[in-house]
């Protein structure tokens, strides 16, 4: 007759077997990949520069990271539903390209980290406590410096020495209002009067340009964030029609037919946003990640447009450009 095993031997054996099975199951199950909620003002997908930035850091969409993309299609009234949807999905990190959306997220969640790629005034709008120590769940990049408006006015003055009245065609919201306010100081120093004009909807643009010409503006500063190429082209065409030298701050403005553009290199901003995502995924807190100012500015000139409005760009200005679209049939 065999001696009976103590009961504890069987219990231990079962426990060991259960542990081994659990380990095998866990090994077979794919590790949870982080979800990035991405809300854009417009567009059909995340910025390619952002995707490249992630790849540089070892993240491949669908393999070790997932991006849940939503677009407002240029309609700010859609932010509330899209913000609620992404928060409801419990994404790990939120990325957005504008201040209004970031503020909407901040109202709904204080726990999901938010990375903003292009904030004009993160402190003034209440997104963060300070540039050095944001202090909440928002961090990221600002796309503007306080001197941007003044720099654009200086460029306009160089190509139009008799510049006296400049219209600022802009969007709504506190960031745009701050831009106008910060530009007033250098405008006074240059003896330029500013005329602030809210762009409104696409159907209002013709009337806005009539108002600008009625105000006798002889220069135009275009501050329209989030416009796609078709809408930018519409604005550029109207500026050409009214023979207004127009400098924009948006990427794609010169390609759309605008005379000149000066502003942060948006592609660099998006690649840097990927760095913020990486840091957050590795355990850093948004409250401790400083807001980053633009690292690179782009100055572009369209000589075709200059010719259309009868303007000659001085060589001293051309030499400083990072990109020049030459006249058609130019041999240079």
Question: Residue locations for each model-derived region?
Answer:
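Short hydrophobic alpha-helices and adjacent helix-cap/hinge residues
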Residues: 1-332
């Amino acid at each position: 007759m065999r001696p009976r095993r103590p009961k504890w031997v069987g219990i231990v054996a079962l426990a060991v077997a259960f542990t081994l099975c659990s380990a095998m199951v866990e090994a077979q199950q794919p590790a949870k990949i982080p979800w990035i909620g991405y809300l854009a003002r417009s567009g059909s997908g995340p910025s390619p520069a952002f995707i490249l930035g992630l790849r540089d850091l070892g993240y491949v969409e669908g393999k070790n990271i997932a991006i849940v993309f939503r677009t407002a299609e240029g309609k700010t009234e859609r932010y509330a539903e899209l913000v609620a949807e992404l928060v409801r999905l419990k994404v790990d990190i939120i990325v957005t390209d504008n201040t209004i959306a970031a503020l909407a997220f901040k109202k709904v969640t204080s726990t999901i980290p938010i990375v903003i790629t292009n904030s004009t005034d993160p402190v003034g709008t209440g997104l963060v406590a300070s540039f050095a120590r944001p202090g909440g769940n928002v961090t990221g990049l600002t796309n503007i410096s306080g001197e941007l408006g003044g720099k654009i006015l200086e460029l306009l003055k160089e190509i139009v020495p008799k510049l006296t009245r400049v219209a600022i065609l802009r969007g709504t919201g506190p960031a745009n209002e701050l831009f106008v306010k910060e530009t007033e100081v250098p405008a006074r120093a240059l003896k330029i009067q500013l005329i602030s004009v809210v762009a409104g909807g696409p159907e209002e643009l013709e009337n806005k340009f009539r108002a600008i010409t009625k105000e006798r503006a002889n220069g135009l500063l275009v501050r329209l964030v989030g416009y796609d190429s078709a809408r930018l082209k519409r604005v550029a065409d109207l500026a050409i029609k009214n023979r207004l030298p127009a400098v924009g701050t948006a990427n794609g403005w010169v390609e759309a037919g605008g005379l000149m553009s000066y502003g942060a290199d948006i592609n660099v901003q998006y690649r840097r946003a990927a760095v913020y995502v990486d840091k957050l995924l590795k355990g850093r807190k948004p409250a401790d990640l400083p807001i980053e100012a633009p690292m690179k500015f782009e100055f572009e000139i369209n000589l075709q447009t200059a010719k259309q409005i009868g303007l000659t760009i001085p060589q001293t200005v051309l030499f400083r450009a990072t990109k020049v679209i030459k006249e058609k049939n130019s041999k240079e």
